[in-house]
Amino acid sequence: MYLTPSEKRINLSKVHPTDKLADQIFAYYKEGERDGKDEIIKNVPLKRIRK
């Protein structure tokens, strides 16, 4: 599924900011944004960090 940058920001905002995995996801997201890989966020297991 294709996500626009604003949709990805909404998804990332649901992640608790103090979670170390959240920082990791944000790093992957920024890396993907630099490389122009919009699909990179879908490979991150968001369910694992929801408590």
UniProtKB/Swiss-Prot annotation:
GO molecular function: actin filament binding; small GTPase binding; translation repressor activity
Subcellular location: Cytoplasm; Cytoplasm, Perinuclear region; Cell projection, Lamellipodium; Cell projection, Ruffle
Keywords, sorted A to Z: Actin-binding, Cell projection, Cell shape, Cytoplasm, Developmental protein, Differentiation, Neurogenesis, Synapse, Synaptosome
Subunit field text: Component of the WAVE1 complex composed of ABI2, CYFIP1 or CYFIP2, BRK1, NCKAP1 and WASF1/WAVE1. Within the complex, a heterodimer containing NCKAP1 and CYFIP1 interacts with a heterotrimer formed by WAVE1, ABI2 and BRK1. Component of the CYFIP1-EIF4E-FMR1 complex which is composed of CYFIP, EIF4E and FMR1. Interacts with FMR1 but does not bind to related proteins FXR1 or FXR2. Interaction with EIF4E stimulates FMR1 binding. Component of the WAVE2 complex composed of ABI1, CYFIP1/SRA1, NCKAP1/NAP1 (NCKAP1l/HEM1 in hematopoietic cells) and WASF2/WAVE2.
One GO CC annotation: synapse
Main location, first listed in the record: cytoplasm
Name of the encoding gene: CYFIP1
Coiled coil: none
GO biological process: axon extension; lamellipodium assembly; regulation of cell shape; ruffle organization
Function: Component of the CYFIP1-EIF4E-FMR1 complex which binds to the mRNA cap and mediates translational repression. In the CYFIP1-EIF4E-FMR1 complex this subunit is an adapter between EIF4E and FMR1. Promotes the translation repression activity of FMR1 in brain probably by mediating its association with EIF4E and mRNA. Regulates formation of membrane ruffles and lamellipodia. Plays a role in axon outgrowth. Binds to F-actin but not to RNA. Part of the WAVE complex that regulates actin filament reorganization via its interaction with the Arp2/3 complex.
Family listed: Belongs to the CYFIP family.
Listed name of the protein: Cytoplasmic FMR1-interacting protein 1
Species of provenance: Bos taurus (Bovine)
